[in-house]
Amino acid sequence: MAMVPEITCDEVDFYRDDDDRQFYEADGPNQKKGYFQYPDLCSKESLLEEDGIQLKFTTQPHQFHQTVMVIVAIEKMKHLNGLSSQFFQDNDLMNIFTNIFQEEPITFKNCDIYESDSSFRLVSSQDCTIQDINQKCLALSKASELRALHLNGRNISQQVIFSMKYLLGDIGSQKTHVVLCIKKNNLYLSCVRRGEKPILQLEQIANFPSINVEKRFIFNKVEINNTTEFESAEYPNWYISTSQMDEQPVFLGNIRGGKDITDFILADF
């Protein structure tokens, strides 16, 4: 229930300004003195029933700006449609606040999204050993060359342990991307072109990057039944391969299901 201080039917001094918002400023508005007559408030028995508002007069002191706020609210309510024919509801109060107070605009900034030169980045790793389907192990020769050979219990320690690092690649790609590193020596398998065809080589890198991984180090890990193939991401249809013969270098070949072996068996270490 809105309450205003007692006033008379005579002319009442008041302060006004063209902008209603100045009534709520902390330092007060640029005040102009004037006069107004408010006949609807002259009688204490007067009820604004057509607006659904009941006014009760009291002699309790009120601050001037509180009185002005009530008068401003009443004036704005009298110009709202639909209040006189129905009970005062929550939506009506919300409409009053919307008319009295001005909402501040919401500001926002546009942000640009940039794509990295390379979309490959490391996410996890797995230590494992790798053998071809003829049970030849991969081992380093004295010349730091990766070879495939049969090892028995006495020299099985020559078998290298790989750190197979998994990468996130292109969005929507169904392929599994990995990097193969000989863990003990930080030797990374990579594919580069020499002459007319790509070859497989080892590169020693102390601090391998976790983002923007160059494509020559990346292999597509393809699982078929219980075996795995490693296809070069840089040179599609070229695979890590071993020879049918023993103690031959591991190489990059483009023949699957032929004399060269492209199927491997992985074992967690």
UniProtKB/Swiss-Prot annotation:
Q: Which residues form the propeptide?
A: 1-112
Gene3D superfamilies from the xrefs? 2.80.10.50
Principal subcellular localisation of the protein? cytoplasm
Q: What does the entry list under GO cellular component?
A: cytosol; extracellular space; lysosome
Q: Where in the cell is it found?
A: Cytoplasm, Cytosol; Secreted; Lysosome; Secreted, Extracellular exosome
Taxonomic superkingdom? Eukaryota
Question: What molecular function terms (GO) are annotated for this protein?
Answer: cytokine activity; integrin binding; interleukin-1 receptor binding
Oligomeric state and partners?
Answer: Monomer. In its precursor form, weakly interacts with full-length MEFV; the mature cytokine does not interact at all. Interacts with integrins ITGAV:ITGBV and ITGA5:ITGB1; integrin-binding is required for IL1B signaling. Interacts with cargo receptor TMED10; the interaction is direct and is required for the secretion of IL1B mature form. Interacts with HSP90AB1; the interaction facilitates cargo translocation into the ERGIC. Interacts with HSP90B1; the interaction facilitates cargo translocation into the ERGIC.
The record describes the protein's role as: Potent pro-inflammatory cytokine. Initially discovered as the major endogenous pyrogen, induces prostaglandin synthesis, neutrophil influx and activation, T-cell activation and cytokine production, B-cell activation and antibody production, and fibroblast proliferation and collagen production. Promotes Th17 differentiation of T-cells. Synergizes with IL12/interleukin-12 to induce IFNG synthesis from T-helper 1 (Th1) cells. Plays a role in angiogenesis by inducing VEGF production synergistically with TNF and IL6.
What name appears for this protein in its UniProt entry? Interleukin-1 beta
Organism of this sequence: Trichosurus vulpecula
